Each structure stands twice: as C-alpha cells, then as structure tokens.
C-alpha cells in the first residue's frame, strides 16, 4: 500500500466539474445530475468485466471445495459487504458461515459511524486470525479509495495464510497499489459531493458484489434457469415464491405444488426433481447429493440413463 497522507490526487477525492454548482440546483436538476453521473457505474462494471468473471470462478470453486467467502471493509464498503453476505442465506439457502461480512468496528459500526477504526492495520490482520482463514477461503477487501489500512491489513494477513485475495477499489492502479490475487478497479470518477464515496463508489461496489455472489451461486447450481431454486422458505412471501417457482416449472396447480413442497421438506430444488423423475424425497436427495446439489446435472444424468 502506498503511504498516503495527502489523498487529494485520488480519483475518489477529486472535484467533479459537473457538480461545482451543486448547492444552487433545483430538486429536479439534482435528480438529473445524479442520474447522469450514475451512468458511470455501468461503464465501470464493463471496464472490469474480465476481473469480475475471474473472481466468480475463483469464488465458486473455493465454495465448492468447502471454503468460505469473506468481505472485509470499513464504513460504507464494510456495510455493503455485510449486506451482500446477509442476503445469501435467504436467497440461496447457504449456511451463515459460507459468506461472511466483516466491518471495521464490528456490528456497532453498521448503525453508527466508526471511521477512526479503519486506520488500524493490525485490526484487519487480527480479524483474519480470529476467523481462522485457511487456503480454501477467499477474502475480498473493499476500499473505495484504495488506502484503508484495516482492509490492507486483512488482505496481507489472508495472503500470509495462503487464502485467495481479491481487492475492490475505485481508484486506478497508478494512484494506489493493492496486493491481491485479483485486482478489481471500478472507476466511476469524482463524486458529485467531493469525497463522498457512499455515492457512485458505493453504488458500483454493490453492483460488483451482486455480480460476484450471484455469479458464484449460479455456478454452484443454486439457480435453475433464472429461478432461485434454493430459496429458504422462511416466511409467507418466500413460501409464495416457492410455490410459484414449482408451478411455473411443472404442470402442477397451486394446491398440488404446495403438497409437493411439503413432501420435499420445503426444498424447492428437491421438489422439482421429485416431480420430474417421479421419485421420493430420499431418492431425490441422494441423486442431488451425487451431483453436488446441481439440479440440471441431476436431471441430465437421469435422462441419459433412460
């Protein structure tokens, strides 16, 4: 990491020429300006597509081998990591330990700013030791400006433990170097409010995390077509979604879909396999396990045998 005391040259700290009269704009002009500037996030994702694709492959393979995915950040970056990690269990029925978000300052920092805690390199290293990171794991360090000591400490400690490391930042490599196996640069330019990286930098970071986690889960077979077939049926909304998925992918009515869902132990993926192959829950579960939980692979295997 570059030893930076002066950060004014960083892309995320620079003055945006398009918003220099920000305090004089009408409400409509403010909305139009935000809309125009946010278009940069799409270009930034496109510019990093190769690195994002490589990261998906690395993460999915690590999770397939029993490893874990950790997001590490401070402030907005940390909160976004925690948010994405928290959404994985209900969306993909993953165990809570599979994808974890780590924020400088811990849970309290989610609701109250703790920016001073991001300056401690040793705290980042310590959290990696506490989570007992192994070579099977992937650690994603998120730092918009690329300089957060907490994140650099975590990445360095993870590398020492031979874990795969991924860095996500919003500054060019010429301004800040980051030691990581995969270096994702999301260049959205100066913020409308100078230095406020909760804006474009935060938006593009969330987009990238959406891509990484969803992409990895797709490759793990937790999606069939574009349906979340591993959805955790934990409330009325998700129960309704589970029924609609079964109905849409079979010829069953809602009552029949409900009966099938219950017989499968409320596992949509298993219910679909049971219906397609005419097998019971135990047989279906065994077949899914044989194919590492991949419904399409299990179905194709059964069809090849017929």
Curated annotation (Swiss-Prot):
Gene3D superfamilies: 1.10.8.1080, Glucose-6-phosphate isomerase like protein, domain 1. Its EC number is 4.2.1.126. Keywords: Carbohydrate metabolism, Lyase. It is an enzyme of class 4 (lyase). GO terms for molecular function: carbohydrate derivative binding; carbon-oxygen lyase activity; ether hydrolase activity. GO terms for biological process: amino sugar catabolic process; N-acetylmuramic acid catabolic process; peptidoglycan turnover. The active site is at residues 87, 118. This is N-acetylmuramic acid 6-phosphate etherase. The keyword Plastid does not apply. Residues 59-222 form the SIS domain. The keyword Signal does not apply. It holds the Pfam family GKRP-like_C. It comes from Gloeothece citriformis (strain PCC 7424) (Cyanothece sp. (strain PCC 7424)). Homodimer. Specifically catalyzes the cleavage of the D-lactyl ether substituent of MurNAc 6-phosphate, producing GlcNAc 6-phosphate and D-lactate. Pathway: Amino-sugar metabolism; N-acetylmuramate degradation. InterPro entries: Etherase_MurQ, Glucokinase_regulatory_CS, MURQ/GCKR, SIS_dom, SIS_dom_sf. A lyase-type mechanism (elimination/hydration) is suggested for the cleavage of the lactyl ether bond of MurNAc 6-phosphate, with the formation of an alpha,beta-unsaturated aldehyde intermediate with (E)-stereochemistry, followed by the syn addition of water to give product. It catalyses: N-acetyl-D-muramate 6-phosphate + H2O = N-acetyl-D-glucosamine 6-phosphate + (R)-lactate. Belongs to the GCKR-like family. MurNAc-6-P etherase subfamily. PANTHER family: GLUCOKINASE REGULATORY PROTEIN.
């Amino acid at each position: 990491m570059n030893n930076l005391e002066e950060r004014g040259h960083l892309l995320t700290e620079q003055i945006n020429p398009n918003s220099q009269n920000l305090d004089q704009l009408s409400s409509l002009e403010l909305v139009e300006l935000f809309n125009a500037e946010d278009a940069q996030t799409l270009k930034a994702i496109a510019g990093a597509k190769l690195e994002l694709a490589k990261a998906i492959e690395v993460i999915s393979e690590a999770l397939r081998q029993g490893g874990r995915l950790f997001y590490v950040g401070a402030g907005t970056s940390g909160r976004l990591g925690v948010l994405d990690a928290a959404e994985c269990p209900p969306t993909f029925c993953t165990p809570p330990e599979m994808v974890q978000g780590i924020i400088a300052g811990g849970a309290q920092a989610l609701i109250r700013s703790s920016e001073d805690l991001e300056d401690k390199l040793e705290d980042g290293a310590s959290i990696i030791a506490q989570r007992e990171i192994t070579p099977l794991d992937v650690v994603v360090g998120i730092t918009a400006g690329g300089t957060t000591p907490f994140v650099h400490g975590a990445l360095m400690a993870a590398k020492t433990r031979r874990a795969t490391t991924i860095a996500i930042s919003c500054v060019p490599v010429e301004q800040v170097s980051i030691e990581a196996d995969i270096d994702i640069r999301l260049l959205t330019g100066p913020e409308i409010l100078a230095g406020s990286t909760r804006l474009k930098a935060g938006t593009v970071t969330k987009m990238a995390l959406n891509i990484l986690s969803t992409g990895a889960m797709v490759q793990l077979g937790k999606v069939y077509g574009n349906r979340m077939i591993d959805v955790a049926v934990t409330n009325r909304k998700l129960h309704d979604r589970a029924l609609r998925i079964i109905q849409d992918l079979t010829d069953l009515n809602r009552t029949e879909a409900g009966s099938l869902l219950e017989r499968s132990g409320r596992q949509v993926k298993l219910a679909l396999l049971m219906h397609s192959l005419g097998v019971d829950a135990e047989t279906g579960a065994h077949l899914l396990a044989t194919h590492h939980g991949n419904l399409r692979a299990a179905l194709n295997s059964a069809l090849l045998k017929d």
